[in-house]
Amino acid sequence: MPYLLVFLSALCLHGLVYYGSNAQMLSLSPMIGPNVPGLLPGNNIQGLAGLGGAGGFGMPIQLGNVDGLQGPIQLQDLNQRFQSLNSRRVGVGSLQNNRNFLNLNGNRLGILTADAASQFVESVRGNSDTVQADSPQVDFNQLSDVRNRFGVASGRSLMHQLSPPPERSRGTESSSSGQSVNEASNGMSFQSISQGFNPNELSLNQIHLSKSRQ
């Protein structure tokens, strides 16, 4: 009997260790950097892990204290809230499991799926924001399957989301690689794609949405 109790205890302990080390398989994301307390909103959004993280289920973002920005906030409020941040920078990237990653003002917040990322991109469209990234070598329109890389949609679809309505005028702008990219009258343009975030963290591609003062 004591051996059975020891075996069951060891089995439970193993289950806890397995649960914690394989959070992705259980719809949980591992803790990614500092300042990531709370949950992201929406049925398609996975909650932040840490200890006791859980799935989204419509839960609000709990930002804690990020440059004076405090949660909880909803996804539709994010584009209004981040305008008050000093860095004016929001990132949407992708993880290897095809879930997107939300980075607010340098603070890594959590995981988004394709629909959630699309909603977020749509929520900031129409503001005076510039879609930027760090690597000028990548031509966004030449990516054959952006869904697998960003979890959003095809390249044309995402460019459409980042573009203004057809009635708005458009211009061109040269990126650091010398290529011209579409720029809307509201300041939206795609320049390049940044690959990699931190070698000590999860590998991801990242798009930066920088708030540009007009």
Swiss-Prot record:
Entry's localization field: Secreted
Polar residues bias (residue ranges): 181-198
Spans annotated as Disordered: 157-198
Keyword Signal: yes
Domain of life of the native organism: Eukaryota
Keywords tagged on the record: Secreted, Signal
Designated name of the protein: Uncharacterized shell protein 2
Region forming the signal peptide: 1-23
Gene Ontology terms: cellular component: extracellular region
Tissue and organ expression note: Prismatic layer of shell (at protein level).
